[in-house]
Amino acid sequence: HSEGTFTSDYSKYMDNRRAKDFVQWLMSTKRNGHAEGTYTSDVDSLSDYFKAKRFVDSLKSY
């Protein structure tokens, strides 16, 4: 039982650490002056992907 708790706590820690590292990366690249357009493009691409995925999933449900 304690091993599972440790694993869960460690996973949460690593998720938080990765999120903090990602935010730091975004902040540092934005300071360099070229992240905004790249970030917007990536978000748009991701948004389009999820819209398409939802559409395909809705077709599969019929």
From Swiss-Prot:
<keyword id="KW-0372">Hormone</keyword>
<dbReference type="Pfam" id="PF00123">
    <property type="entry name" value="Hormone_2"/>
</dbReference>
<comment type="similarity">
    <text>Belongs to the glucagon family.</text>
</comment>
<comment type="function">
    <text>Promotes hydrolysis of glycogen and lipids, and raises the blood sugar level.</text>
</comment>
<dbReference type="InterPro" id="IPR015550">
    <property type="entry name" value="Glucagon"/>
</dbReference>
<protein>
    <recommendedName>
        <fullName>Glucagon</fullName>
    </recommendedName>
</protein>
<keyword id="KW-0964">Secreted</keyword>
<dbReference type="GO" id="GO:0005179">
    <property type="term" value="F:hormone activity"/>
</dbReference>
<dbReference type="GO" id="GO:0005576">
    <property type="term" value="C:extracellular region"/>
</dbReference>
<dbReference type="InterPro" id="IPR000532">
    <property type="entry name" value="Glucagon_GIP_secretin_VIP"/>
</dbReference>
